[in-house]
Amino acid sequence: MDSRICTSFARLMASALCVSTLLVTAMPFDLRRGSSDTDLDLQGHVDLGLDDLDKLRLIFPPGLIEEAFSQAQGKVDMPLPRQRTSSRSSERWAPKSKRFDFGFAGLDTYDAIHRALEQPARGTSNSGSGYNMLMKMQRHG
């Protein structure tokens, strides 16, 4: 498996773990007996404000939080995202997928630098690898 696929999958799983941790800590569960003795009916209620949810949307990819809410059993109150208005203060907390992508772009750049420093440049000695790495970063940048 390609290392980029593994890295992307690990990042996605880490995001899902963070979302599930936040949901579990914010959700008081009522444990009740289900139809049989071994079944438990988990009914949770999440009371997150719009500000909290909008901040989570800036950190995690679009759709991940909604998916986590939809998979939760029981009653979940899902606030709708804020609508954009003309004021700049409301746009600051509006969900933007570009902010999430930009956060991982820094990690991708770090991975590219790390790989370039580990591999010596072809046809040159190890002393030229730093210069070639900088040239690669200028082309990507």
UniProtKB/Swiss-Prot annotation:
Q: Which GO terms describe its biological process?
A: neuropeptide signaling pathway
Q: Which residues carry this modification: Histidine amide?
A: H140
Superkingdom field: Eukaryota
Cell location: Secreted
Question: Which residue spans traverse the membrane?
Answer: none
Q: Which UniProt keywords apply?
A: Amidation, Cleavage on pair of basic residues, Neuropeptide, Secreted, Signal
Q: In which tissues is it expressed?
A: Neurons.
Q: Which GO terms describe its cellular component?
A: extracellular region
Region called Disordered, residue ranges: 75-94
Kindly list the cysteine pairs connected by disulfide bridges.
Answer: none
Q: Where is the signal peptide?
A: 1-26
Its main localization is secreted
Biological role = Mediates intrinsic neuromodulation.
Name it: Neuropeptides CP2
Native source organism of the sequence: Aplysia californica
